[in-house]
Amino acid sequence: MIHYLKSFFLYEIVRGMALTLKYFFKPKVTINYPYEKSPISPRFKGEHALRRYENGEERCIACKLCEAICPAQAIVIEADEREDGSRRTTRYDIDMTKCIYCGLCQEACPVDAIVEGPNFEFASLTHTALIYDKERLLQNGDRWEQALASKLRKDYEYR
């Protein structure tokens, strides 16, 4: 019986070493991350951004659909009515530590105001830096507008 267990154990070690050697001589599939970047899918969901119209006016009409549909309750919106009767946001906050990047806010938005952009490098050392206010979201939208617009055009037929 002991001989059987020893031979079984030896067999497993040899089998494991064979598997290791099989992959040892194959080309590496990992990348050297900060210096090399892997391609990103066109439907990648990254850092949030608020978009503007071509004339510079923000797109958000304060319908609060994104706030209502967010499963993590990461979005907080406050709005006021303008003199012309339209509504605009006075406060638009997203707690990125709560966000699960599901994309439901982007799907719910009737005017494509809130989108998830291509940026995935927004780590921070503090919690407060990951609570995005309206100004930060608009800056993200201005910075990534070209990429966001082309991404939405490519995906338009599927929406």
From Swiss-Prot:
Xref: SUPFAM superfamilies: 4Fe-4S ferredoxins
Keyword terms, alphabetized: 4Fe-4S, Cell membrane, Iron, Iron-sulfur, Membrane, Metal-binding, NAD, Quinone, Repeat, Translocase, Ubiquinone
Its EC number(s): 7.1.1.-
Major enzyme class: translocase
Cofactors (names): [4Fe-4S] cluster
Subcellular location: Cell membrane
Its membrane topology: Peripheral membrane protein
Reactions listed under catalytic activity: a quinone + NADH + 5 H(+)(in) = a quinol + NAD(+) + 4 H(+)(out)
Cofactor descriptive note: Binds 2 [4Fe-4S] clusters per subunit.
Binding site for [4Fe-4S] cluster 1: 60, 63, 66, 109
GO cellular component assignments: plasma membrane
Predominant location category: membrane
InterPro entries: 4Fe4S_Fe-S-bd (IPR017896), 4Fe4S_Fe_S_CS (IPR017900), NADH_quinone_OxRdtase_chainI (IPR010226)
Gene Ontology MF, one: iron ion binding
GO biological process: aerobic respiration
Record's protein name: NADH-quinone oxidoreductase subunit I
Protein source organism: Rickettsia africae (strain ESF-5)
Lineage of source species: Bacteria, Pseudomonadati, Pseudomonadota, Alphaproteobacteria, Rickettsiales
Name of the gene: nuoI
